[in-house]
From Swiss-Prot:
Keywords: Actin-binding, Repeat. Transmembrane segments: none annotated. Residues 301-397 are annotated as: Disordered. Calponin-like repeats lie at residues 29-54, 73-98, 119-144, 161-189, 209-234, 255-280. It comes from Caenorhabditis elegans. This is Calponin-like protein clik-2. It comes from the Eukaryota.
Length: 397
């Protein structure tokens, strides 16, 4: 579907995709996401329920279920045909210690009332000391010995705490001036005779946090906003109060770079999370997009402002400059070569002077050096005469 719309023939006009064609593939799931055309669990019961595999068949259709097995639990779910706890007491209740068996023919039901008072040793024993008559679970234990028959109502020690729980007879925190409650600050001010501190002076010290808990008199985060709020570092700096309110609000639509940015490439306009990717090789919208792109390039070439680079070859402008620079450099090299070809006065060679200094000490080479100097002087005189002749000829011309 859609191949004829994107054919390369130029005789027929290009067709457009209709809404029905565009939505034609919405009912199909791609293979990478699965499929909805084969065996499914459509119509199944809720999660964890047994599957109905005997009442419905693809070929025979609906099959009437056999209700004879509805009173029997399958073995994989358990069974209700053997020994059970039917008729037992609730969870956590004491188990009947007297056998109560009715499905054994040879056993008789025994109801020994004498044995119901005694707990067997495997479960414990209540014939000795117990907690019968104690208070509820977690209550304070009565530290005074409750001995039956001897001072049963003696309350003389009820106001004294035994040492295993502490004591209330020595130094305590009773009468502290701080408000009651866990974690209250202890009042450490001592009352000195002749130097009584009034209540106003005592309350004035509650404004300050003591040093061992920190302090509340220096730089804080008071008024900085809610938790994880971006800190406003512009208006409260030195000179920030002079900034106008309009300038302060300009940066409110920009996400700072430390948290990311909303000014560059993003995935805005993408499909929803988890949407299958379009894996078709010949997508019509791609070819249409390329054609629109080429048309936009052509329009730009026709209406581009003077001096701008070509969109097809954006580096052509720099290429021309490079060629001009290379041609000017080559012309300079040619002019230098022409100047070098002109006759120039020969300069005395340094190598010959060095050799003359080395040969001064040799007496045998003095004569040769004198001859060479005479020859050089003659050559210089000849060159000067030639130059004078050339100048005279130029003046005559």
């Amino acid at each position: 579907m859609g191949e004829e719309d994107w054919s390369d023939t130029q005789q027929q006009p290009r067709k457009r995709w209709t809404l029905e064609q565009l939505k034609g593939g919405n009912t199909f799931l791609s293979q990478q996401a699965g499929t909805n055309k084969f065996e499914t669990q459509k119509g199944m019961t809720a999660v964890g329920m047994p599957r109905w595999n005997i009442t419905k068949d693809k070929k025979q259709g609906y099959i009437a279920p056999d209700q004879r097995s509805e009173n029997v639990l399958r073995v994989q779910c358990g069974t209700n045909q053997y020994a059970s706890q039917k008729g037992e007491t609730p969870i956590g209740a004491s188990r009947f210690q007297v056998p109560k068996v009715t499905y054994k023919k040879e056993w008789e039901t025994i109801l020994d009332k004498e044995g119901e008072k005694i707990i067997p040793k495997q479960a414990g024993d209540y014939g000795l000391a117990s907690q019968a008559g104690e208070v509820s679970m977690g209550g304070h234990r009565n530290q005074v010995a409750l001995i039956r028959g001897r001072l049963p109502h003696d309350r003389r020690t009820h106001g004294v705490l035994c040492f295993q729980n502490g004591t209330n007879l020595f130094a305590s925190q009773t009468g502290m001036s701080a408000p009651p409650g866990l974690g209250a600050v202890r009042q450490a001010t001592q009352k000195i005779e002749g130097l009584e501190l009034g209540e106003d002076i005592l309350r004035r010290g509650t404004e300050f946090t003591p040093w061992y808990s920190g302090q509340n008199k220096f730089a804080t985060q008071a008024g900085s906003g809610g938790f994880l709020k971006v800190r406003d570092v512009l208006p409260h700096t030195v000179g920030g109060k002079d900034i106008e309110e309009e300038l302060k609000q300009k940066s409110e639509g920009i996400v700072p770079l430390q948290s990311g940015t909303n000014k560059l490439a993003s995935q805005r306009g993408m499909t929803g999370f988890g949407t299958p990717r379009n894996t078709q090789l010949r997508a019509g919208w791609k070819k249409e997009w390329i054609e629109d792109y080429e048309a936009a390039l052509k329009e730009w070439e026709e209406t581009k402002p003077p001096g701008s680079a070509s969109s097809v070859d954006p580096f052509g402008h720099y290429k021309k400059k490079f060629e001009e620079r290379e041609s000017s450099r080559q012309s300079e090299i040619d002019s230098q070569s022409v100047k070098a070809s002109e006759p120039v006065e020969p300069e005395p060679e340094e190598e010959e002077e060095e050799e003359e200094e080395e040969k001064i000490e040799e007496p045998a080479a003095k004569e040769e050096e004198e001859e060479e100097e005479e020859e050089e002087e003659e050559e210089e005189e000849e060159l000067e005469e030639e130059e004078e002749e050339e100048e005279e000829e130029e003046e005559d011309e």
